[in-house]
Amino acid sequence: MIENILKNNNLKVTNQRIKILNIINELGCNSTLKNIINNSNGVDTSTIYRTIKTLEDRNIIEEISGINDDVIYVISDSNKHY
């Protein structure tokens, strides 16, 4: 599923992108930046920021407002069917 999302959006499939998308998918409504970083197991923080920016720019993920104005990242509806 995750690899297809990247391929269908003309992005190179990398371990970091797969890992971050899997984390977002698994955490669901708890996928704040802090939780993504805490669950990334060794992925450099700057890589996480760049990857999230790339995924947002390609509309693969989107931001939603959570409790206490936390930003939560979710996989965009247009990519959930992969």
Regions found by a protein language model. Give the residues of each.
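Non-DNA-binding regulatory cores of transcription-related proteins
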Residues: 57-82
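Short acidic, hydrophobic short linear motifs in intrinsically disordered regions
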Residues: 30-39
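Short helix-capping/hinge SLiMs at alpha-helix to coil transitions
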Residues: 11, 25-28
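Short alpha-helical segments that sit at the start of domains
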Residues: 1-21
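Conserved beta-strand edge residues that scaffold enzyme active sites
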Residues: 20, 38, 68-70
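Basic amphipathic alpha-helical segments that dock to polyanions
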Residues: 48, 52-58
